[in-house]
């Protein structure tokens, strides 16, 4: 019997898994892979959209984190993943917020004891034994402190999982990627948006708002979603209703800033560790499992 491919995605807050890697997750779950998502906080500091859930916000009832467990559960279901997995257990570390956010009662993720956080992720890696781990780049994508710390913790955990420290049998992760945004495809997708894709109160993103993209020659892999995975990504984004609004055509979404973001059907990656598999004419892998030997993955 062919071995089932296993992939692990590490994210900072509920909704990050859908925004940056939703199509990839749905693509591999549909192919029968064992896909798991680790979320490092409950996203308590998120900016709530609209009045319906406004009282959940941190400066009111401070109940947003618990509510977002339900949103993440629903989003993962749309992507074909099981129950949420929170690093250290649900609520162990609090969303740190953006720079300048005051400390709260519970320990923020950026203040976590690094050995404890790394050890918690090592335990997940050694239990699942993933062939691929996906995290963030050193800037954490757009620079959120929790995203930066996810990079630190994930990088250390991938290295430690294959060594002798921490309990459990070591597992050397074959391939480790960063999830990144590719500048050219993003800009092309923005240019392709039409007024019909947007809500009346949305604006188009400016070049100054998108400074963290990667040039084509710095990209190592792309996962091009089919119609099923793209639809699953849109449904997962809609499940995060306190944080994301999906536009009328399903081709764009917006966060609380009302800046339109194209819902990409391609997601891009940088290979950090491990050997690349076959590449296309752009020099990109088109499968995160490329170069790893599997028989036909079971379908479901």
Curated annotation (Swiss-Prot):
GO MF term (any one): N-acetylglucosaminylinositol deacetylase activity
Cofactor(s) needed by this chain: Zn(2+)
Recorded superkingdom: Bacteria
Enzymatic reactions: 1D-myo-inositol 2-acetamido-2-deoxy-alpha-D-glucopyranoside + H2O = 1D-myo-inositol 2-amino-2-deoxy-alpha-D-glucopyranoside + acetate
Cofactor: record remark: Binds 1 zinc ion per subunit.
EC number annotated for this UniProt entry: 3.5.1.103
Alphabetical keyword list: Hydrolase, Metal-binding, Zinc
GO biological process terms, semicolon-separated: mycothiol biosynthetic process
Residues where Zn(2+) binds: 13, 16, 147
Function, in words: Catalyzes the deacetylation of 1D-myo-inositol 2-acetamido-2-deoxy-alpha-D-glucopyranoside (GlcNAc-Ins) in the mycothiol biosynthesis pathway.
Record PANTHER family: 1D-MYO-INOSITOL 2-ACETAMIDO-2-DEOXY-ALPHA-D-GLUCOPYRANOSIDE DEACETYLASE (PTHR12993:SF26), N-ACETYLGLUCOSAMINYL-PHOSPHATIDYLINOSITOL DE-N-ACETYLASE-RELATED (PTHR12993)
Record family assignment: Belongs to the MshB deacetylase family.
Protein's UniProt name: 1D-myo-inositol 2-acetamido-2-deoxy-alpha-D-glucopyranoside deacetylase
Gene for this chain: mshB
